[in-house]
Amino acid sequence: MNVDDFDFELPDRLIARHPPAQRRDARLLALTCDALEHQQFPDLLSHVHPGDLLIFNDTRVIPARLFGQKESGGKVEVLIERVVDDHEALAHVRASKSPKPGSWLEFAKGIRAQVTGRRGALFILHFSLPGNGCDTLLSALELIGHVPLPPYIDRPDEDGDMERYQTVYAREPGAVAAPTAGLHFDDAMLAALEQRGVDIGFVTLHVGAGTFQPVRVDKVEDHHMHSERYQIPGSLVEQVAQAHARGGRVVAVGTTALRALEAASQSGGLHAGQGETDIFIFPGYRFRLVDALVTNFHLPKSTLLMLISAFAGRDRIMGAYRAAIEAQYRFFSYGDAMFIEGTQPASRNTQHVKSGADE
C-alpha cells in the first residue's frame, strides 16, 4: 500500500490557526453507514444513543516548549517529549549546533538543564531548579513554558491557547499535543450527553510530538510508529462490559482514545493497566473494540488519516475529505470535526479484564 494513496491537496486558507469563539462552534461532517451529512457539532447528539459509551482521553497538555540559550549564548528551543521524573526529561532540542553531553542550557527564572546524554533523536535533560515553589519539572514548565502548538498553526502561542488547546476534562498531565477531537466539548455538551443516557468514560494516552512527524517511507507497511504511554482504568473495563451487555456502542472521542483502547484489546477483551503502545492502524486492521469515532480532520499522508481509512474505508474517507474541502471546512487541531461509523462491527470478545499486568 502506497503512502501517496493518502495524499490530498488542502488550500492553506482552510488550516485553522485559531480556535472558534466557543468550543462547540464547529461544523460536523457525519459519515454514517449510508449517508454523508453536513451538520453543526452539537448535532453529534443525534448520532449517539442511550446506552452508548463515549470514551475520552483525559491527558493534560503541559506547557512543554521552552526558549533559552546555551552557555555560549546561542539560542536554543526545547520541546519536552516526556517528563521522566521531577528533574529529568526527554526532549527535542533545536539550536544552530547540537549541545554536547555535559553542557548546560539556561532558561528564565534561574532554571537550568544539563544535557546528560541522548536516546535516539531525543536529548536527556536533567533540570536544576531554584526552589521556592519551583521544585519539580512540572512546576517549572508551568512557570516558564509555552503551549506546544502544532507546527502547522505557524504562530507563537497566545494567552488564550493555554485554555483552548486543552480539553475541559483534562486531568492527567503529560501530553505535548492535545487530543483535539475533545476540544469541541464544553461542560454543557457533556451534561447533554449524560441527560440523553449516554455513558462517559476516560482513558489516558499522553500524546507525544511524534504525532506530527511525517511518514518518510513510500510503503505504508514500512512505517514504524512512535511510542506513547497509556492507562486503562479498571472502572472503564466495567463500563465497556456494561455497554456491551445492554447492546450499546463504544464511541472513541479522538484517535488517541481509539489507539489506547485498541492497544489494550490486542489479546482479546479490554485489559486494565498501563503501558506503552506503538500500535499502527492502517487499512486491513480488524478493530476489536471501537464502533464509532469522533475526530478532527487530519494531515495528508499522515498515520491518522490511514487510521480513519482503516476504520471507514479509504475511498469513503477520501471522498468525505473532498466534500469537506469543497464545503470549506476548517482543518486540523483547531478545526472542524467528523463523526464516523465504522464499516465493520468491532469484535465482541466479552472477556474484559479489570486488573492485570501492564501491557
From Swiss-Prot:
Compartments in which it is found: Cytoplasm
Q: Name one GO molecular function term.
A: S-adenosylmethionine:tRNA ribosyltransferase-isomerase activity
Instruction: Could you list this entry's UniProt keywords, alphabetically sorted.
Output: Cytoplasm, Queuosine biosynthesis, S-adenosyl-L-methionine, Transferase
Pathway(s) it belongs to: tRNA modification; tRNA-queuosine biosynthesis
Instruction: Specify one Pfam family.
Output: Queuosine_synth
Q: Please indicate if the UniProt record lists Transferase as a keyword.
A: yes
From the UniProt record, give one GO term of the biological process aspect: tRNA wobble guanine modification
- Listed EC numbers: 2.4.99.17
Which InterPro entries is this protein grouped with? QueA, QueA_dom1, QueA_dom2, QueA_sf
Q: What is this protein called?
A: S-adenosylmethionine:tRNA ribosyltransferase-isomerase
The cross-references to HAMAP family, in alphabetical order and at most eight, read: QueA (MF_00113)
Quote the NCBIfam families the UniProt record gives. PRK00147.1, queA
Which function does this protein serve? Transfers and isomerizes the ribose moiety from AdoMet to the 7-aminomethyl group of 7-deazaguanine (preQ1-tRNA) to give epoxyqueuosine (oQ-tRNA).
Subunit: Monomer.
Q: So what does this thing catalyse?
A: 7-aminomethyl-7-carbaguanosine(34) in tRNA + S-adenosyl-L-methionine = epoxyqueuosine(34) in tRNA + adenine + L-methionine + 2 H(+)
| Originating organism | Alcanivorax borkumensis (strain ATCC 700651 / DSM 11573 / NCIMB 13689 / SK2)
One Gene Ontology cellular component annotation held by this UniProt entry:
cytoplasm
Name the family the entry cites: Belongs to the QueA family.
Check the record and name the Gene3D superfamilies matching this protein. Answer: QueA-like
